[in-house]
Structures are given as structure tokens and as C-alpha cells.
Amino acid sequence: MKVILKENLDNLGHIGDIVKVAPGYARNYLLPKGLALEATTKNAKALDHAKKHLEYKKNKVLEQARQFAARIEGIALTLSHQAGEEGKLFGAVTNMELAENLKAQGVEIDRKKIVLAEPIKQVGDFTAIIKIHPEVNATLKVTVTKA
């Protein structure tokens, strides 16, 4: 029996693939759980239309992510922390602190999306990577000064 997959399945294929499976597997598992549709011309046309719509939405989200990344890259954060004689900070600058400072500047982002290559424990200039979308990353410039 031929079916059209509605979801990615490790053992069968990806969304939209037309695969041949055992009739019992299709009737008892794939179709009742909504993982696949019977492969008819009507269902194939409906799936093509849904694919085009999803592609349009994906491109729109990607463009919004790129605009958001450009907005973030235009920001330079300056933080002042207490530091010792040699510029070593008492504590460290965390991604949570960076998220709070970005929020104060009108850019709200989840702290888990901010990636620091290494903890910021010195006075100086640093960069942080912000993962906005699986295909779009932004670079944030962070300057830490002595308070």
C-alpha cells in the first residue's frame, strides 16, 4: 500500500514522501495516528499545496530572523563590573545578565540562545553569538569596564 507521509519518520522518510508499506502497518498504525495519508491524487495535490504554503511561511520567518539579527548586530553592550587590580572581575558576566541588558534596550531574547565562547571574567571587549534561528546567528559586541 502506498502512503504519503505527514511527518518525518526515521524508518520511512520525510514529510511528503510517497512510500510503500505493508497494508496492516498503514491501516493499524500510520493512518490512525495521523502520520500518513493514503496515496491518492487528491491527497497528493493537497499535500503539494500545503508544502508551498509551508515553504512561504518558512521563508517569511527566515527573513524576520535576518532582520532581527541585523538589529542585534547594531547594538553594542557596555557593562561595568567591580574588578581587581589586574582587570579580573569579581564574578563573571553571564548570558542571563546579557539577556537582561538587551531587554533594557528593547530587544527581548531568551538567555539560552546567547552563547559565550568562554565565561567573561576579565575587563575588555568580547563577542557573544545569539542563535535566533537554526540558519541565522547574530554577533553581539560586549564591552566590560571596571566600575
Swiss-Prot record:
GO molecular function, one term: structural constituent of ribosome
Keyword annotations: Ribonucleoprotein, Ribosomal protein, RNA-binding, rRNA-binding
Keyword RNA-binding on entry: yes
GO biological process: translation
PROSITE patterns in alphabetical order: RIBOSOMAL_L9
Pfam families on file: Ribosomal_L9_C (PF03948), Ribosomal_L9_N (PF01281)
Entry GO terms, CC: ribonucleoprotein complex; ribosome
Signal peptide: none
Family: Belongs to the bacterial ribosomal protein bL9 family.
Chain's role: Binds to the 23S rRNA.
UniProt cross-references to NCBIfam families, sorted A to Z: L9
Name of the protein in question: Large ribosomal subunit protein bL9
